[in-house]
Design a protein with these regions (language model features):
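Ribonuclease/tRNase effector modules and their secretory precursors
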Residues: 1-79
């Protein structure tokens, strides 16, 4: 799991973003383009729920491009 510098602008560190993105509790495709954009919710090592946008390439490579503390409107998506 790679983390783009743009994903860090909301104060989430790269390790936390990668951990949350690698083990999502919610995942949804945002479009059918290539690379596919996926919206994910996951927890970092501090147990913060993060919202993430991850590019998923056909090769299997994944790149986090957005990471921030999850906004309340996404809590209903949790299982």
């Amino acid at each position: 799991m790679e983390v783009h510098a743009s994903a860090l602008k909301h104060g989430i560190d790269a390790d936390g973003a990668a951990q949350a993105a690698a083990s999502p509790v919610y995942l949804s495709d945002l479009d059918e383009e290539s690379p596919a954009r996926q919206f994910r919710l996951g927890f970092d090592s501090s147990c913060r729920l993060l919202e993430l946008v991850v590019l998923h390439f056909d090769s299997g490579r994944e790149l986090v491009i957005h990471a921030m503390k999850a906004r309340p409107k996404y809590l209903d998506l949790l299982p």
